[in-house]
Amino acid sequence: MYSNMLVSCSNCRTPLQLPPGARSIRCAICQAITHIADHSRYAPPPPSIPTTPPPPSTIAPPSPYNHAPPGPPPNQHGRKKAVIVGISYKYSRHELKGCINDANCMRHLLMTKFQFPQESILMLTEEETDPYRIPTKQNMRMALFWLVQGCQPGDSLLFHYSGHGSRQRNYNGDEVDGYDETLCPLDFETQGMIVDDEINETIVRPLPQGVRLHAIIDACHSGTVLDLPFLCRMDRNGQYVWEDHRPQSGIWKGTNGGDVISISGCDDHQTSADTSALSKITSTGAMTFCFIQAIERGHGATYGSILNAMRTTIRNTGNNPGGGDVVTSLIGMLLTGGSGGGSGGLRQEPQLTSYQPFDVYTRPFSL
């Protein structure tokens, strides 16, 4: 009777596929249980004279699980939601040391500097005890869907990823360089990577007018991993031009009126460092560290000032990987313990992509 039936989670509104005959289902994102009424027990009411329908109730039914995340509370400026993914690939030949540190630092930054409610931040790392918050391919897909689900004008969304990135040959003609950029979930060797086309379809194209999305991507080959139409090409003097990356195939890669900007760790042909040369305490992703430091040191007024500050820090580290004190109060507070393996010079240039060109030195940065 319920074959292929879709229902919405009673708490976070994520669409769920109900198994045949089931009377309830647990949401993989927020863990709330949604109960399904069996309408087959009741005969339809007889036809009656049309009357004016009562006004719809404004009181939402309570969640059956009080401990389930209720979602970000609405306010006059809209809601704030974030998905933060940090993958260390522990005990594998792909292991990274800094990615879970990146995730913890980013969560703290969002809560303390940008007033993101803790309950509106969905963390996916190997340290999570909830199996639905382990950064597998399926869980990452569901988290990205949750991020944009039900968004409304005034909402501010953020996606942060720290982990491996890669690229693969593109065959549909929608990439200027001939390659699709990819993110590597924890189980990518068996389940495959998440391709930029899918990320664009999930969190970029559906975004309605009045909603803002920022992506902070600390991974190799990540310059255009959201497949946004325009890339800001900036030189060492801070001069920039916007490159048009709209595919010749005519496939639309923009939004449904929303505002999307991505700051990524490096260009599509570059690799992104996992290093202890920056924090001097433990390994972090170079890009994540430099982004947080730019905000902490007061360089977060505009997108141009952030990008310049990040690039300067990485260049200085590349020229002098062993010197200089660049530990901010936030990093120093969050990161404890030692790490092995420093880094040589860093060869990467953080990139900015957008759904449309804008003046990076006059547009205020805001999350």
Report residues per predicted region:
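Short, non-ligating residues that shape and space the ligands of small metal-coordination modules
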Residues: 17-19, 36-37
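Short Cys/His-rich micro-motifs in 6-15 aa windows
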Residues: 30-41
